[in-house]
Amino acid sequence: MSVSTALKLCIFFTGFAGIVAEYSLATLATYLLGNAVLQWSVVISIFLLSMGLGSHASRYIPDDKTPLAFVLAELFLSLLVPFSVPIAYHFANNFLHLQTVIYGLSFVIGSLIGLEIPLAVRINNMYEELKVNISSVLEKDYLGSVPAGLLYAYLFLPKLGLPLTAILAGFFNLISAFLLVKVLKPKKFLKFLAIFTFFLLATYAVGHKRITLYEEQKFYGEEIIHFEQTPYQKIVLTRFGKHYSLYLDGHLQFSTLDEKRYHETLVHVPASFLKRYEKALILGGGDGLALRELRKYPFGEIHLVDLDPKMIEFSKKNLVMRKINENSFYDTRLKVFSEDAFNFVKKTKEKYDFVIVDLIDPRTPSSARVYSLEFYMSLKNKLKEDGIFITQAGDTFYKREVFCSILKTIKKAGFYAYPLVVYIPTFGEWGMVIGSKEPLNFENFELKEKTEFLNRERALAFYTLGKSLECPNVEVNTLLKPVLIYYYYKIQN
């Protein structure tokens, strides 16, 4: 194999590895720091800046040292990219240190990636004329980037998970280093260094699960009994003593210590106002806990919409989850749809008596859609005239603007809106909003089913507390102006 051919293969592999490295660090930042839009923007921007600086720095490398510099850059990348995952998790419980570590890693890795193309062009300059040299090097870099981006989204992250994906990127960098070592025949120390790097990376690849589990358990502070990366999210179930907690992408969804406070309020307060029990819809609620409470009512049909079929499978088959949700997914009245909730509401021809919106907080543009004016207007058309819906509306203490914006948006859609605030020890003061086409009378409120935590007095107290909250001057959340994302991260930032 000629040096020029080997070099072009190297550039293809480095283009592939570079995109995987960028996406892996952006995903890692999202998992640990939150705010997907912000983290992807910041990490990719840091990469672009550092790649430019790396390209600039390449001019100071003497011509006779360019092959050595290229190989060393690939060897460093082959270790730095894979090890960035456990390094970041090690600092996961310190927000300021974590930001410095992730952004610092992005800068260093980006700088090394920035060296690649200028060095490759200079090495290849001996074998091809300038116009062919530059175009062929850039061509191979771009061609390597395209499959990397697609495979990352559709295969690597959902099937391999983040740690193994980063290891894969490292091996592509290592292959590039070995190719150049083979054709350039450098000094023995470089061959030894390449072999040593291979053994380090291979050892980490074999033991990465143990290392990752150790760092993950430090992050969650509890024993991890189930860990799964799906195409949509990372599912983690933990145990602490007799209690279990579920996390999605690092965010707590429930703890068995107090989840009934949330789910009983979410279901039984609005359900007690219903005049008919024919057809119900749950949007989200893939853990089956809202469904567990809803099954107590004599609905003829229950539809549940959750984007992630793996979440449904986990909740249906995992023995711990089955015990918590009381085998709710085996109810014969249930029909599950693995679809996006926003799109389902928009296209369905069904009319419902009761709708429960039990979805994640509006942390991203995608999740903010199901708290938008357009969504609530679509939902209004899917409710019967005496139908009722309820949505979770987030933390009312630290993120009151989020709660107030959701409340205002529901009113803007033409609903009668009734705020509830329930205290949940693991979450704090948590808001919910009931929406109805007809006015509801809380003075005559009576629970229709037996509950473990909820009673009439508590339900009325939750409504009284909800009404008493003073809302700041917030905007309505829309698709074109998703203000909820700004409100959600305002306190944290």
UniProtKB/Swiss-Prot annotation:
Single Gene Ontology MF annotation: spermidine synthase activity
GO BP term, pick one: polyamine biosynthetic process
Residues involved in spermidine binding: 263, 287
Location relative to the cell: Cell membrane
TM ranges: 9-29, 32-52, 68-88, 101-121, 137-157, 161-181, 188-208
CDD domains: AdoMet_MTases
Major site of localization recorded for this protein: membrane
Domain PABS: 202-437
Catalytic reaction(s) noted: S-adenosyl 3-(methylsulfanyl)propylamine + putrescine = S-methyl-5'-thioadenosine + spermidine + H(+)
Pfam families documented for this protein: Spermine_synth
Database matches in InterPro entries: PABS, PABS_CS, SAM-dependent_MTases_sf, Spermi_synthase
Assigned EC number: 2.5.1.16
Binding site for S-methyl-5'-thioadenosine: 233, 306, 340-341
Active-site residues, as the UniProt record annotates them: 358 (proton acceptor)
Residue segments, region Spermidine synthase: 187-448
Oligomer status and interactors: Homodimer or homotetramer.
HAMAP family, A to Z: Spermidine_synth
Protein name as annotated: Polyamine aminopropyltransferase 2
The gene coding this protein: speE2
